[in-house]
Amino acid sequence: SEQADALLMAWYPGARGGDAVAETILGRNNPAGRLPITIPRAEGQIPVYYNKKRPANHDYTDLTAAPLYPFGYGLSYSTFEYGSLEARQSGDNVLEVSCRIRNTSDREGDEVVQLYISDMVASTVRPPRQLGGFRRIRLAPGEQRQVSFTLGDEALALIDPQGRRGIGLRTHEDDAEDQQPGQRQKNRHGPNLTFCKKLSHMQRLFTYRPAKAGTYHCAPPESSRRR
């Protein structure tokens, strides 16, 4: 990344891979692939993966701790603009998260919209970020489209120390992005998955209460209750 503007990874492209690579380099094909792995900057960073917590200011003396290419990273000949992220309840145990995407370039292209879920506070230890879903869409120059994600119990549930799956008391945050490392539009959710829009203050939108029979609610730790 310090020596070139772009790097084309063809992986195992098959018998016609040479033609595909040539068409991409010549601009006849507009790529939109995203990395399914994280590429470390140095071997000392291994293991490195997208949902691993990296403490603030935890850099090496002569090297940043950020990976060379993070999970979900990718380039395109087109550019895209993200609108506001919206969340609403659709039914008793289904959440709809949507964002408007616009092609701001003069070329038709595909965009991979990625939704990441973060737990700000939870009753059990959670990864700092989890991929909640992704959509690949094709947009003409100037075209815009609303992209929606549906999140249910399966996407939002916790696993407790006994291996049970359920909805716990927690604070959520959603990111809609074109690639994993940056942060674009966000929505926050609070205890019982109370959805809020991130403004100058926390504005309550609705409270998510699962209706599925047998769904339990994890109790927060003692330290959380004392606060």
What function would you assign to each model-found segment?
Residues 219-226:
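Short, intrinsically disordered C-terminal tails of secreted or membrane-associated proteins
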Residues 108-115, 127, 159-161:
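Short, hydrophobic/aromatic beta-strand segments
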Residues 123-159:
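Intrinsically disordered, low-complexity Pro/Gly/Ser/Thr-rich segments with frequent PxxP/GP/PP motifs
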